[in-house]
UniProtKB/Swiss-Prot annotation:
Assigned EC number: 1.14.11.55
Family as reported in the entry's similarity comment: Belongs to the PhyH family. EctD subfamily.
Role, per record: Involved in the biosynthesis of 5-hydroxyectoine, called compatible solute, which helps organisms to survive extreme osmotic stress by acting as a highly soluble organic osmolyte. Catalyzes the 2-oxoglutarate-dependent selective hydroxylation of L-ectoine to yield (4S,5S)-5-hydroxyectoine.
InterPro entries xref list: EctD, Phytyl_CoA_dOase-like
Record's protein name: Ectoine dioxygenase
EC class: oxidoreductase
GO molecular function: 2-oxoglutarate-dependent dioxygenase activity; iron ion binding
Cofactor binding annotation: Binds 1 Fe(2+) ion.
Record gene name: ectD
Binding residue positions for L-ectoine: 128
Keyword terms: Dioxygenase, Iron, Metal-binding, Oxidoreductase
């Protein structure tokens, strides 16, 4: 077991530490699958939005399959869904790269996974995948957090060599609850307060209350770095570092949001025992044993 380089949830007062790991693991930017300045932007800000990476026809295909799964009683009863805390409507369906042939192919699409492979510097596997819905009028907010804090403490992910990829299936506009991020926050790790409860994921995936930063830390991060919204038309893709501070507002507009979400982790950064006193989260939330490196290649869907 590796040493705990990013402790959290151990003290009664929050604290900060500087990031110990690179953000971009390759320096040969001339060989990057995207423009060098985009890689440099990811290094600086901790996220990147690439508009129109997928075509309108591809998005329509993905949305049709997403809606089919959303209405499938077998999916609803699979134990791999998260529902809105008030309405009971499906918010997320997990493990789509394992349970759905189409979305398994999307996980290995060179347009997205190839970028992740370059940034992380080698072979990848999918730590987590899901499709997300934020309905119009009733979509709830999700509070500020660093994904890595949870993946480290509750899943045992040793280092910051992981990133998320969100494929937008609807237009993300400032008014309909898009992802908000603090540019530059990924270079600072906020140690949170509060012991991890048993089976915490059952509640935290609906509304996280443990493993969230204190308000003073959030205020300081926002003061230093500001807050940006990841907006773009359907077919755009948002890449963001595992430690970038992010969250989203509720959606009280008629404009629903949905996306496909893949977490790419380097194979050398596979999870181990959690850095807390609880058992690991289930595999549909955090892949632990049955993974192999992605066979990243161009994909044809139409």
């Amino acid at each position: 077991m590796q040493a705990d380089l990013y402790p959290s949830r151990q003290e009664d007062q929050p604290s900060w530490q500087e990031r110990l790991d690179p953000v971009v693991y390759r320096s040969d930017l001339e060989n990057a699958p995207i423009a060098a300045e985009l890689v440099e932007r990811f290094e600086r800000d901790g996220y990147l939005v690439i508009p129109n990476l997928f075509s309108a026809d591809e998005v329509a295909l993905f949305r049709a399959e997403l809606e089919r799964m959303r209405q499938d009683p077998a999916v609803a009863g699979s134990g791999k869904t998260i529902k809105e805390p008030d309405s009971g409507a499906i918010r997320s369906v997990f493990a789509i790269h394992k349970d759905n042939e189409l979305f398994a192919r999307v996980a290995a699409d060179e347009r997205t996974a190839g970028i992740a492979r370059f940034i992380l510097g080698g072979d990848l596997y999918v730590h987590q995948s899901r499709m997300n819905f934020k309905p119009g009028f009733t979509g709830k907010e999700f509070y500020w957090h660093s994904d890595f804090e949870t993946w480290h403490i509750e899943d045992g992910m040793p280092r910051m060599r992981c990133l998320s990829c969100s494929i937008l299936l609807t237009d993300n506009e400032p008014h309909n609850g898009p992802l908000m991020l603090m540019p530059g926050s990924h270079k600072h790790y906020v140690r949170c307060v509060g012991a991890t409860p048993e089976n915490h994921y059952e509640k935290s995936l609906r509304k996280q209350e443990i493993g969230i930063p204190d308000q003073n830390s959030l205020s300081e991060l926002a003061s230093r770095f500001g807050i940006d919204c990841a907006t773009g038309p359907a077919g755009s893709v948002v890449f963001f570092d595992c430690n970038t501070m992010h969250g989203s507002n509720g959606n009280i507009t008629p404009s629903a949001r949905s996306n496909l979400f893949y977490v790419y982790n380097h194979v050398d950064n596979a999870v181990q025992a959690p850095f807390c006193e609880q058992k690991p989260r289930p595999a549909f939330v955090a892949e632990r044993e049955n993974f192999k490196p992605l066979d990243i290649r161009p994909q044809q869907y139409l």
